Amino acid sequence: MASLKRSNDRKVTNYVHVTKGGNATVGIANSIGLPSGQGFSCPDATAFCAKVCYAGKLEKVRKAVSSVLLHNWELLRDADLTDTVTLLSEMMADFVKDCDKKKAPKLFRIHWDGDFFSPTYVAAWARVIRDFSDVQFWAYTRVQTAAVYLHAQKLSNLSLYFSADPDNVDVARFLEGKGINIAYVDTTFAEGKAQFPTAVRCPELNNRDFDLINAKGSACARCGLCINGRKSVLFSTTKK
């Protein structure tokens, strides 16, 4: 069976390699991606999301990135539960080996691009997250059924966020009432704060001096807000 391919992401990596020239680069690939859009892995993508999706834009300009995402999609799209669990488990086992070798914290982002596209796929991830209890996972999803299902599994090593924007804010409020954290994006932080007053601004977007990656780690690893699921979080498309 072919293997899934992990992705390098400077913003979320759990291990930074510093070159002799002093440049901080990704040392471990700690995320998986799938092609975005309703025609692929994002069944509940909104119009707002499609308009601002940075990952979708990256797919169009970087053929190598798109190739990896499509490779993963072809392996997973029609796989049954057993095969999906096997594919994800083998990928995570390789990730754990990399972390142990470099003595890195085991932090893994599910979907830097893409989403939970089917009930089978969601159920497989729930099983894998439980099996890899020494890994801290975090994920954002616009799929309401996926958010409800994963939240109900009470997975202590998963920080889960329902991804919201002006187009699905009513669903987000409903899920917030069920105890699910919200990751809300709007044009400005002020507009987001008006919708979710207790949510906090993403430090990487809110602070221009907050490096995407440096010798001390990636932005997400240094912050830890989403990784540890502390609170609902706000994002702004204008960084204002």
Curated annotation (Swiss-Prot):
It comes from the Viruses. Pfam families: GP88. InterPro entries: Gp88. This is Gene 88 protein. It comes from Mycobacterium phage D29 (Mycobacteriophage D29).
